[in-house]
Amino acid sequence: MTVTIALPSKGRMKDEASAIFERAGMKIAAVGSDRSYRGRVEGWDDVEIAYLSASEIAREIGSGAVDFGVTGEDLVREGLADADARVDFAARLGFGHADVVVAVPEIWYDVDTMADLGDVAADFRARHGRRLAIATKYWRLTQQFFSGSHGIQLYRIVESLGATEGAPASGSADIIVDITSTGSTLKANHLKILSDGVILRSEACLVRARKATHEGNPVIDRIVAAVRAVL
């Protein structure tokens, strides 16, 4: 059985993932040209590398098309309804840190918690004749957090296709759920994160698809052990 590991195809995520695998004794070499989307691991004949976008990696792990992937936890949990049943977060890799957060306009002085926001949402229709609008690319995580964790039902999600942080200023939404590393972009757009509004503290992870063929497979166990040993 050949084990396929999906890695980010470009950028810092690709470089940092490759560095971790090299420290783990799994040096990656390109197959073909530098622009090839395939790779191999030197000395591991039963392992191949596939280079994909971060969102593609989350989808391919969920479908079982690849065995491992390095991608953000936020993308996996947003893309898969039952993430923990379908994948195993085998290792947290210590880079790509970012938080998925609830942010509201700074001028909402009396709104500092999700409970405060729940009160606003309940009152919003009476005051404005519509539901509270939330701009986000994370509709699944938003629904789970608002409805599941905090019992807030009176809202609607506006799909964000561009810069989510600009939605309140443009009038397309009232608040946002977005990912942030430093919070500086939110502050620049006069938004504040609620005190209990961190939905997920995400980072890059080595994620394994839960497949029956992995049970008792020494290559699977060896990969996980090698990566964990260098973290």
UniProtKB/Swiss-Prot annotation:
Pathway involvement of the protein, from the record: Amino-acid biosynthesis; L-histidine biosynthesis; L-histidine from 5-phospho-alpha-D-ribose 1-diphosphate: step 1/9
A single MF term (Gene Ontology): ATP phosphoribosyltransferase activity
Keyword line: Amino-acid biosynthesis, ATP-binding, Cytoplasm, Glycosyltransferase, Histidine biosynthesis, Nucleotide-binding, Transferase
Listed InterPro entries: ATP_PRibTrfase_cat, ATP_PRibTrfase_CS, ATP_PRibTrfase_HisG, ATP_PRibTrfase_HisG_short
Catalyses which reaction(s): 1-(5-phospho-beta-D-ribosyl)-ATP + diphosphate = 5-phospho-alpha-D-ribose 1-diphosphate + ATP
GO cellular component terms given for this protein: cytoplasm
Record's keyword annotation contains tRNA processing: no
Record's keyword annotation contains Transferase: yes
Pfam short name (any one): HisG
Annotated EC: 2.4.2.17
EC top class, as a word: transferase
Localization per record: Cytoplasm
PANTHER family: ATP PHOSPHORIBOSYLTRANSFERASE (PTHR21403:SF8), ATP PHOSPHORIBOSYLTRANSFERASE ATP-PRTASE (PTHR21403)
UniProt comment concerning the protein's domains: Lacks the C-terminal regulatory region which is replaced by HisZ.
Assembly and binders: Heteromultimer composed of HisG and HisZ subunits.
Biological role stated in the UniProt entry: Catalyzes the condensation of ATP and 5-phosphoribose 1-diphosphate to form N'-(5'-phosphoribosyl)-ATP (PR-ATP). Has a crucial role in the pathway because the rate of histidine biosynthesis seems to be controlled primarily by regulation of HisG enzymatic activity.
Record-given protein name: ATP phosphoribosyltransferase
Lineage of producing organism: Bacteria, Pseudomonadati, Pseudomonadota, Alphaproteobacteria, Hyphomicrobiales
